[in-house]
């Protein structure tokens, strides 16, 4: 007697009986297709943390992991903020606001990551700090891209940073040449018939936006989201310099900068000073 298993809805082969499957394969092994590890390239990812000091220093792995995580999040922020700018350029303000709010969450996460670094004592850091020279956070190309995209364009950085690869220089040149978030916002003001020339005109336009919420509430809300981006960036810089002082005091940076004094000078920088000045006129 021959049994047609297709009619039973089950299995007599010892494999899974769920849904009538007779494959005998485990979850995630459907014919060698994509898996969690292969999709995320986990083996390759975990091979990128390569401590430098001998004998090993326990906290060097933590230091590498945190900074690599920063670079991954910088990549994501560039992805989101570029899309924010493009959405403003095409007057999709709802989309720009949605992605800016996502960027805010990521930026708060970046501030909180400093707490992880501060679990490392100054003595722990000194076990491997000398091996970092002449590398420096100053050399983070993606961090500079974020500043340029946000509106703080500094062509002099390319001259000061002599170890840029050709690909890195092309990326930074591209960010300097393309419109910033602020450029895109000024374009929105102009599209509403508001003056967007010199700073005095822009400030007058912003005052009108703030005072006529009935007509311009979408522009007001978007400006507030840009200001939050500016505020969170400043919060990260302030938190970062505190962490540096806690670790190394006023020593020079590994890349040759003045260290904490240089970082202190960067803290007051604002991407959108006119949005801050606007408060004086409300």
For each predicted feature, which ranges?
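Surface-exposed peri-terminal alpha-helical interaction modules
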Residues: 2-8, 20-282
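Short, low-complexity S/T/E/D/G/P-rich linear segments that nucleate or cap local secondary structure
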Residues: 11-18
């Amino acid at each position: 007697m021959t049994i047609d298993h297709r009619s039973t809805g089950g299995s007599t082969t010892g494999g899974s009986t769920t849904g009538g499957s007779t494959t005998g394969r485990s979850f995630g092994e459907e014919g060698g297709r994509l898996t969690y590890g292969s999709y995320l390239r986990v083996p390759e990812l975990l091979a990128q943390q390569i401590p430098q000091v001998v004998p090993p220093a326990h906290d060097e792995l933590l230091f590498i992991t945190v900074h690599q995580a920063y670079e991954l999040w910088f990549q994501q922020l560039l992805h989101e903020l570029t899309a924010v700018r493009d959405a403003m350029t095409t007057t999709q303000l709802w989309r720009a606001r949605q992605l800016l709010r996502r960027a805010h969450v990521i930026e708060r996460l970046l501030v909180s990551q400093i707490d992880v670094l501060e679990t490392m004592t100054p003595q722990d850091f000194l076990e491997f700090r000398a091996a970092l020279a002449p590398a420096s956070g100053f050399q983070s190309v993606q961090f500079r891209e974020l500043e340029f995209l946000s509106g703080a364009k500094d062509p002099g950085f390319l001259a000061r940073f002599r170890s840029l690869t050709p690909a890195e220089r092309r990326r930074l040149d591209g960010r300097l040449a393309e419109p910033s978030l602020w450029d895109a916002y000024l374009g929105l003001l102009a599209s509403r018939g508001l003056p967007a020339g010199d700073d005095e005109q822009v400030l007058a336009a912003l005052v009108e936006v703030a005072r006529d919420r009935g007509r311009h509430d979408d522009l007001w809300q978007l400006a507030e989201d840009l200001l939050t981006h500016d505020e969170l960036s400043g919060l990260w810089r302030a938190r970062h310099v505190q962490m540096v002082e806690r670790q190394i005091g006023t020593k020079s940076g590994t890349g040759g900068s003045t260290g904490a004094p240089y970082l202190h000078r960067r803290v007051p920088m604002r991407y959108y000073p006119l949005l801050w000045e606007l408060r004086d006129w409300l």
